[in-house]
């Protein structure tokens, strides 16, 4: 099958990682995969390294009709059968190109993107008339789509992100920069406003009052990095927090931590949380994260209310004071059962084959 995936994420992200993993696995299975993404994006570089065809376009706006002919040309030149659109900037232009060329088009929703007012009505037209199917990466996102847009549930398939399990080992390594008596908690995230990180820094101030022997590592870069560092100074927790910048050795880092935290008020699924669970490390997530349907609260992780630093602190303390190593084992078992890359890519293949079969039977649909 000839598949083209569209993405407009400028930075490396969980969504970009999902596209990379899916593309590699689909290529291994004999499919012809191409990716269209932003010039100079992290995804463009990583896809090219895997010798997968990559094309770069920048729509600049959600409805830039001037770019539609370029997308049509890419579709025809590569004999594309299925178009998978993963970013809003490509939703309209790629859907229109797919409709003009009578190709199967799906949208992959990996973050909530809940809208109101005019934007909600515009999206309703898109979802009901221009796309053949929608993939949601969590049950939570599917529920919200059905609720917000009155979509039939059968038009949405939940396919989770996939994990390369062999990259993540449960064997514990030496803890990062601390004595064995210390707890190590990690956040692995883009350091941006929407990630709940300021709330988490406030939670650290509360956590350290009860658990002095804790070291928090924050892995990632972003627009509010300086602001977060200043906040740790203001709250007098800088000695307990280590900013590690962007890192590629995530499996090695996770092997040396006890728990991870995803403080985002809204998160589709969180690749960093899945990687943590694959490493046998339990996670604290908010109810805004798609993992609420996966984690068993107080058994394989901890679930807290979003935007509440006290609740976040209590969730971290509760997990560390429990048998968090057993919670990590249960978290790993969940990932093995539901998120193994071959399993989820098979689900993706079967969906695309079914959509193509329907397209052949009803070519004008």
Residue ranges and their predicted role:
Residues 105-133, 143, 150:
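A conserved, positively charged/aromatic
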Residues 62-66, 143-148, 153-155, 160-177, ...:
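Acidic anion/phosphate-binding donor-loop and adjacent secondary structure
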